[in-house]
Amino acid sequence: MSAGGASVPPPPNPAVSFPVPRVTLPAGPDILRTYSGAFVCLEILFGGLVWILVASSNVPLPLLQGWVMFVSVTAFFFSLLFLGLFLSGMVTQIDANWNFLDFAYHFTVFVFYFGAFLLEAAATSLHDLHYNITMTGQPLLNDNQYNINVAASIFAFMTTACYGCSLGLALRRWRP
């Protein structure tokens, strides 16, 4: 008790004073019924295919395709994490501006994947170049590697397009 007989009010409980998370996408399985959820699923599918195809070509040009592998593997796992946070409903428990985080994530990955797509297409275009081993010209990419890299380039483009669509949807949610 204080000097005047009045009691001091208890300090506010910090758990009660947290603001509500800002997210306009639904949490739980309902995320899969939205365009954004469908695009994230396509990003995971196509990104996984890029990863598998580049790895199966034995990475004949590591300087170019190393970045493609890094981007595809990293984006694959972060997209899985992103989808997992929404499917589990954790986005409603974590105080963050999820609309901005969605935009920032998709912008970053779109820029990186666009660069990866260009590098993969550049690696594929080197099919007709030859290098000299003991006076015999050997192609940089054999026909099997070329075919795999063509498929990887196509899926890298499709993945980039999916990230671009997700970026557009995220921008609409973030900037009403």
UniProtKB/Swiss-Prot annotation:
Membrane-spanning segments: 35-55, 67-87, 103-123, 150-170
Lumenal side: 56-66, 124-149
Subcellular location: Cell membrane; Apical cell membrane
Signal sequence annotation: none
Residue ranges annotated as Cytoplasmic topological domain: 1-34, 88-102, 171-176
Entry membrane topology: Multi-pass membrane protein
Pfam families xref list: MARVEL
All residue ranges annotated as the MARVEL domain in the record: 31-175
Gene Ontology MF, one: structural constituent of myelin sheath
Glycosylation sites: N132
One GO location term (cellular component): apical plasma membrane
Keyword terms of this UniProt record: Cell membrane, Glycoprotein, Membrane, Transmembrane, Transmembrane helix
GO biological process: myelination
PROSITE patterns hit by this protein: MARVEL
Primary subcellular site in the record, as a coarse category: membrane
Family affiliation: Belongs to the MAL family.
PANTHER family: MARVEL-CONTAINING POTENTIAL LIPID RAFT-ASSOCIATED PROTEIN (PTHR22776), PROTEIN MAL2 (PTHR22776:SF42)
Oligomer status and interactors: Interacts with TPD52L2.
Its biological purpose: Member of the machinery of polarized transport. Required for the indirect transcytotic route at the step of the egress of the transcytosing cargo from perinuclear endosomes in order for it to travel to the apical surface via a raft-dependent pathway.
Protein name as annotated: Protein MAL2
Native species: Pongo abelii
Gene this protein is translated from: MAL2
